[in-house]
From Swiss-Prot:
GO CC field: cytoplasm
Family affiliation: Belongs to the DapB family.
Group of enzyme by EC: oxidoreductase
Keyword NADP listed: yes
Gene: dapB
Binding site for NADP(+): 36
Name assigned to this protein: 4-hydroxy-tetrahydrodipicolinate reductase
């Protein structure tokens, strides 16, 4: 049975990748696309209905799944529209505030919503194994992270970096906002033990690199995840689009639920 998907932000880099891969997938149908009015003409290549009003477009695809890599504000508007239309909603947008995440969780009580700041299978497997690593190493190991992305990325640190850092903090029994350090400069004194440094690099066309450091007496462990193309994230999002309609509303689903 084919799953009908609606791609929002279809004129963007992620959106166009998702459209192409959806059309190549035998069990998916690209049913509609959504974009800003000034970009609609560029969507003719997909040969499917298009529009700029999420409410109007979503209503034309009953039982469909919205796949959304846009902006925090657009994704929240899309989430409300998807809930009104009764369609499922897969969100890969990063940079959501705590308030926006709370609203998604509230909407998910009666709607099917899936949100992951990183749709990569590898990153989400990493989220599963990091707690065991951190707990077995013990608190004598300092935890740091460096993330690298292209020069057009708007949020910093990346949503993936923050989720990985949350995972590290939770494994230590810490609250990330209390221990995260995003900036070091000048005479800052010795490094506190209860700290996680998160550093950001931006440049070129780098899709995404995240390196976690665990540094202890006489040794250092480095774990790096490197995304080579956006197809990695698109594949995870389309896998979620096939999975989500089979689930019941009531919780904000994530990659860890699907895996």
């Amino acid at each position: 049975m084919s799953t009908s998907i609606i791609v929002t932000g279809a004129g963007g880099r992620m959106g166009s990748t998702i459209c192409r891969m959806a059309q190549e997938d035998p069990v998916l149908t690209l049913a509609a696309v959504v974009e800003r009015p000034e970009r609609l003409a560029s969507l003719d290549v997909w040969k499917c209905p298009s529009g700029s009003d999420p409410d109007a477009v979503f209503a034309t695809v009953p039982g469909g799944v919205v796949v959304d890599f846009t902006s925090p504000e657009a994704s929240m508007a899309n989430a409300r529209a998807a809930a009104r239309a009764g369609v499922s909603h897969v969100i890969g947008t990063t940079g959501l505030t705590a308030e926006q995440k709370a609203e998604l969780a509230d909407l998910a009580r009666t709607a099917r919503i899936f949100w992951a700041p990183n749709m990569s299978i590898g990153v989400n497997v990493l989220l599963k194994i990091l707690p065991q690593l951190v707990q077995q190493l013990g608190e004598q190991y300092d935890l740091e992270m460096v993330e690298l992305h292209h020069n057009r990325k708007k949020d910093s640190p990346s949503g993936t970096a923050l989720r990985l850092a949350e995972c590290l903090a939770e494994a230590r029994g810490w609250n990330l906002p209390d221990v995260a350090n995003y900036h070091r400069e000048g005479i800052i004194g010795e490094r506190p033990k209860d700290e996680i440094g998160i550093q950001t690099i931006r440049g070129g066309d780098v899709v995404g690199v995240h390196t976690i450091y665990a540094m202890g007496p006489g040794e250092r462990i480095e774990i790096t995840h490197q995304a080579h193309s956006r197809e990695n994230f698109a594949q995870g999002a389309l896998r979620a689009a096939k999975w989500l309609p089979q689930q019941q509303p009531g919780t904000l689903y994530s990659m860890l639920d699907m895996l």
